[in-house]
Amino acid sequence: MSAIVDIVGREVLDSRGNPTVECDVLLESGVMGRAAVPSGASTGSREAIELRDGDKSRYLGKGVLKAVEHINTEISEAVLGLDASEQAFLDKTLIDLDGTDNKSRLGANAMLAVSMAVARAAAEESGLPLYRYLGGMGGLQLPVPMMNVINGGAHANNSLDLQEFMIIPVGAPSFREAVRWGAEVFHALKKIINDKGMSTAVGDEGGFAPSVENHEAAIQLILQAIDAAGYTAGEQIALGLDCAASEFYKDGHYVLEGEGGIRLTAQQWTDMLATWVDKYPIISIEDGMAEGDWDGWKHLTERLGKNVQLVGDDLFVTNTRILKEGIDKDIGNSILIKINQIGTLTETFAAIEMAKRAGYTAVISHRSGETEDSTIADIAVGTNAGQIKTGSLSRSDRIAKYNQLLRIEEDLGDIAHYPGRAAFYNLR
């Protein structure tokens, strides 16, 4: 009864008004699974390829009709009749059908839409919520949210080079309370920014995007908001940064326009980050160095890797081959997990498992271009990942994930576990 009998791909829109791929999978029993894939703005060069049409007369060349056509033709022909409960076999079928190392022929967006929709259909068929279907009886842990309350870089139109300034409610007793704490800080921050005469417009991920004099000014705004909301920075709410350093790495230097255009070597940039870590309660730094600057990453890890979570996003691109190289070379201590960077659920889960075995944390993440699809919330719980990045406390495309996690926590009841600071088990 779990045989796949129909697949339909379609072009829909993401949160930036750009096309993305959605897929419906129908099983013999009559149940259906639906999934839509996200899209990034700052992307790693080694990510699986997102297939776009390139036709400038439609959506400025960003249409995805080719990817949709692949779903409705050769992917459909290859997977019709397969058992939806055999996720690994289905994903391998997609990988073999594509035949490239980076999924450039069929498109990772086409393949992921099918992979996710099949999992949703199989979960529905089994009568289990998606998180339980994906993780079995072990999925009891809610993730600690890393909430992006100030946006910069490629996600905003302001003077900040760093892409995300996040609050992390490590002291909350539950996920529900963590969300409440985050929302209250978000609203306090809005008032502070407004009272200073700055814009309260939000960026792609729902955080504010004020034009401030430098990066420390942004951090200080957040600390003021934490205090105004009645919480203690560090003890109750820690800070995290996503530098997205590849975006400002030019000719072997880190060029910070938001700091007066200074040009820093990797060592000097590490010194600046270390100064911030000493001065502020920062416990996580993502993409602190450019994806190709492995020497810089090594220096950063040696300097800060014992007391700060160093997350590789563009560095590892959810790819087990690259992650293994990083583990072998002691680069970073955490991986960001973005399902569309690799293109199938099976490969996503393999990256999470590899990270955990090596003592690295795995942070489940959205993309800046999102939809109402909340699959990553279920993945975070199903894999006991412990951490999630899904934006600020605004924009329905971000809130969809928080709301799904609230439902999951309610469903788990007394056995739900919120790890708080223990989710950062890579810190000594």
UniProtKB/Swiss-Prot annotation:
Q: Which of UniProt's keywords are assigned here?
A: Cytoplasm, Glycolysis, Lyase, Magnesium, Metal-binding, Secreted
Q: Its annotated pathway?
A: Carbohydrate degradation; glycolysis; pyruvate from D-glyceraldehyde 3-phosphate: step 4/5
* Disulfide cysteine pairs (residue numbers): none
Q: Say where the protein is mainly found.
A: cytoplasm
Residues recorded as binding (2R)-2-phosphoglycerate, renumbered to this chain, are Q163, K338, R367, S368, K389
Q: What class of enzyme is it?
A: lyase
The name this protein carries in UniProt is: Enolase
Q: Which organism is it from?
A: Paracidovorax citrulli (strain AAC00-1) (Acidovorax citrulli)
- Where along the chain is the active site annotated? E205, K338
Chain residues that bind Mg(2+):
D242, E286, D313
Q: Which GO terms describe its cellular component?
A: cell surface; extracellular region; phosphopyruvate hydratase complex
Q: What is its EC number?
A: 4.2.1.11
| UniProt xrefs under InterPro entries | Enolase, Enolase-like_C_sf, Enolase-like_N, Enolase_C, Enolase_CS, Enolase_N
Does this entry carry the keyword Plastid? no
GO BP of this protein: glycolytic process
Question: A GO molecular function for this record?
Answer: phosphopyruvate hydratase activity
Q: Which PROSITE patterns match?
A: ENOLASE
User: Which compartments does it reside in?
Assistant: Cytoplasm; Secreted; Cell surface
Cofactor notes: Binds a second Mg(2+) ion via substrate during catalysis.
